[in-house]
């Protein structure tokens, strides 16, 4: 029987404990495991290489994304770095979105400057620019859809097909939607990665990442390198992640519903100069999103019509929205891209990506939607007092 996403998320790892019959899998905190005899190791020998708790959550994540296997890492950034370590060598080209997450941009840019590989940042929604970049014969193509922070949507299937034509490996960062709303492997990607810190865990108490591959041989190679460079995830984080994963689908449904109400509210506000959400017909890639996603997601961003003082007054008027980086938790967060999530990008790079100095990003939580809108109303009231 093919299981639905909600069932996979809830049931993963349940009733697997044969020793005591625990319904919920236990946390295996041991760093090392004894051998049964000389040259007779067990399934696990050292927790950096393998851990029973990590095994359970890796199987769950692989099943949710439809992959052959998954490798859990200690951060989302280490998941990205793991992929580039495996697939790129000095001289190889990486093609990445020009408006990608600021941490990814900083990593690629800094390692390219050290000669680890070459990187080309391109607007992947511009087919001419994308084809020109692919003509340079990249080894790896990273796709981020929807993008961070402008929620631009690109055609994953098309980009992965074009990448395959030039012999490139395609990897999709699916952090913004989670497997509950989008499955890149089914759209043709070779790999999918997540910052598990975000929606997969959903409670802002874990830092972790994951890479999931279609090919079991690639999973084996990723796991070997993750152990080799020491970026595998820990047992306690694995346990918390598995616990959070069980409520992924209902959390996404409620957060998405709140986001849609907030988008509708923001459309009525004179201080909102631009609004970005895939549900909006004017949003770049709206029609693609309607086709390749199972929902429009709970992330949105908007530009305030004003200056830094307007921003300060607006943010100061909020009490429910927490001013913080990250996203995907049950609580609603708001962040200022230029000084927070994308501070690692040079001002000219932010400008080229369309990230303005008054852009705010919202990660919608699962609080009461009317309370969230009332809080935004307080923010706009404060902003207008200047």
Swiss-Prot record:
Pathway: Amino-acid biosynthesis; L-methionine biosynthesis via de novo pathway; L-cystathionine from O-succinyl-L-homoserine: step 1/1. GO terms for molecular function: cystathionine gamma-lyase activity; cystathionine gamma-synthase activity; pyridoxal phosphate binding. The keyword Repeat does not apply. SUPFAM superfamilies: PLP-dependent transferases. It catalyses: O-succinyl-L-homoserine + L-cysteine = L,L-cystathionine + succinate + H(+). GO terms for cellular component: cytoplasm. It holds the Pfam family Cys_Met_Meta_PP. Its cofactor is pyridoxal 5'-phosphate. PROSITE patterns: CYS_MET_METAB_PP. Keywords: Amino-acid biosynthesis, Cytoplasm, Methionine biosynthesis, Pyridoxal phosphate, Transferase. Binds 1 pyridoxal phosphate per subunit. Its EC number is 2.5.1.48. Optimum pH is 7.8 for the gamma-replacement reaction. GO terms for biological process: cysteine biosynthetic process via cystathionine; methionine biosynthetic process; transsulfuration. Its main location: cytoplasm. The modification N6-(pyridoxal phosphate)lysine is found at residue 198. It is found in: Cytoplasm. It is an enzyme of class 2 (transferase). Homotetramer. Catalyzes the formation of L-cystathionine from O-succinyl-L-homoserine (OSHS) and L-cysteine, via a gamma-replacement reaction. In the absence of thiol, catalyzes gamma-elimination to form 2-oxobutanoate, succinate and ammonia. NCBIfam families: O_succ_thio_ly, PRK08045.1. Belongs to the trans-sulfuration enzymes family. This is Cystathionine gamma-synthase. It comes from Escherichia coli (strain K12). The lineage of its organism: Bacteria, Pseudomonadati, Pseudomonadota, Gammaproteobacteria, Enterobacterales.
């Amino acid at each position: 029987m093919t299981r639905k996403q909600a069932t996979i998320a809830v049931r993963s790892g349940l009733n697997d404990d044969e020793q005591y019959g625990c319904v919920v899998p236990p946390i295996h905190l041991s760093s090392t495991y004894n051998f049964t005899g000389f040259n007779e190791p067990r399934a696990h020998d050292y927790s950096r290489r393998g851990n029973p708790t990590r095994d359970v959550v890796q199987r769950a994540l692989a099943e949710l994304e439809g992959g052959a296997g998954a490798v859990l890492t200690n951060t989302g950034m280490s998941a990205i770095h793991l992929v580039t370590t495996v697939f790129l060598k000095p001289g190889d080209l990486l093609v990445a979105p020009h408006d990608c997450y600021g941490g990814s941009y900083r990593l690629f840019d800094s390692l390219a400057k050290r000669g680890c590989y070459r990187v080309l940042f391109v607007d992947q929604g511009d087919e001419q620019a994308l084809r020109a970049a692919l003509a340079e014969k990249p080894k790896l193509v990273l796709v981020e859809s929807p993008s961070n922070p402008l929620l631009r949507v690109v055609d994953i299937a098309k980009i992965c097909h074009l990448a395959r034509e030039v012999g490139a490996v395609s990897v999709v960062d699916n952090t913004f939607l989670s497997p509950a709303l989008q499955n890149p492997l089914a759209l043709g990607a070779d790999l999918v990665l997540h910052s598990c810190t975000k929606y997969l865990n959903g409670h802002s108490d874990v830092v972790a990442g994951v890479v999931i591959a279609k090919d079991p041989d690639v999973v084996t190679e990723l796991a070997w390198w993750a152990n080799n460079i020491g970026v595998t995830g820990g047992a306690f984080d694995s346990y918390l992640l598995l616990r959070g994963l069980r409520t992924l689908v209902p959390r996404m449904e409620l957060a998405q519903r709140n986001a849609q109400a907030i988008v509708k509210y923001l459309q009525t506000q004179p201080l909102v100069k631009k609004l970005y959400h895939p549900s909006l017909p004017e949003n770049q890639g709206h029609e693609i999103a309607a086709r390749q996603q199972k929902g429009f997601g709970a992330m949105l961003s908007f530009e305030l019509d004003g200056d830094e003082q307007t921003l300060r007054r607006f943010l100061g008027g909020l009490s429910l929205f927490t001013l913080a980086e990250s996203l995907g938790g049950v609580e609603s967060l708001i962040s200022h891209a230029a000084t927070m999530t994308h501070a690692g990008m040079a001002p000219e790079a932010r400008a080229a990506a369309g990230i303005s100095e008054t852009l705010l990003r919202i990660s919608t939580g699962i609080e009461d939607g009317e309370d969230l809108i009332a809080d935004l109303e307080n923010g706009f009231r404060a902003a207008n007092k200047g």
